[in-house]
A protein has these predicted regions:
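Short beta-strand-to-loop acidic/aromatic patch adjacent to the donor-nucleotide binding site
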Residues: 56-68
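Residue-level recognition of beta-strand->loop/alpha-helix junctions
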Residues: 35-37, 88, 183
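Glycine-rich phosphate-binding loop at the start of an alpha helix
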Residues: 42, 46, 71, 166
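Active-site nucleotide-sugar/metal-binding loop of Leloir-type enzymes
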Residues: 46-59
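Conserved catalytic core of nucleotide-sugar-dependent glycosyltransferases
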Residues: 49, 70-154
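N-proximal low-complexity "stem/linker" segments adjacent to membrane-targeting elements
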Residues: 1-43
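C-terminal catalytic/acceptor-binding lobe
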Residues: 1, 141, 145-197
Length: 197
């Protein structure tokens, strides 16, 4: 299988992040690395998707420039193979053990799944409405089935905003794709006050 592992970043990648990517078990797959710099996150992610389509990749693994992935991230994200699978990362600046994963039952994206909730799950995966892309494996066909842009920021009249990763999740669901989160892929985050095991 041919996989593009790409980091979208405006400036650079943190050393610890690169080390975690370097140490990741490639599971015998052909894995190419790209760091797309100099763009906001939405534009960088769109460029990465286009590289995957143009390069004939089967999957794209996006890892944020401040996210520490576990060594078995790729192995678990591919077990079993799915269209969109997210790793789990702490939500920014919170002590409530929240993640940027919104439950499938929440219509307005106002709720977040917590690590305590995820710790109580019996299976390895859970379907979510939307989730952050700090660590995300996407089958390239998903991008091919979507309209461009795949990632975008949306601002609404009440001044609320839809982030680029949530936008992707909504658009992918409109194309009948499910968004899954893998409870085995617990990522660290250099910019978060709290990290959970």
């Amino acid at each position: 299988m041919k996989i593009l592992l790409a980091v979208p970043t405006f400036e650079h990648i943190q050393n610890e992040v690169f080390q975690a990517i370097y140490d990741m078990d490639k599971c015998g797959h052909e894995v190419d690395f790209r760091c797309v710099t100099g763009h906001d996150c939405a534009k960088a992610r769109n460029i990465i998707a286009d590289i995957a389509i143009g390069g004939g990749y089967d999957y794209v693994l996006m890892v944020d420039s401040d996210t520490i992935i576990p060594k078995d991230a790729l192995k678990n994200l591919l077990d079993p193979p799915s269209d969109v699978v997210l790793g789990i990362c702490p939500r920014k600046n919170t002590s409530k053990k929240e993640t940027p994963l919104c439950p499938i039952s929440c219509p307005d994206l106002s709720e977040s799944l917590t690590y305590d909730y995820l710790d109580g799950l019996k299976g390895n995966r859970i379907e979510v409405k939307v989730g952050g892309f700090a660590c995300a494996l996407v089958k390239t066909k998903v991008f091919e089935d979507m309209m461009y842009p795949y990632f975008d920021y949306k601002t609404y009249g009440d001044r609320s905003m839809l982030s680029e990763d949530y936008y992707f999740c909504v658009m992918a669901q409109n194309c009948e794709y499910k968004i899954l989160a893998d409870n085995r892929v617990r990522c660290g985050h250099l910019a978060r006050y709290y990290q959970y095991e």
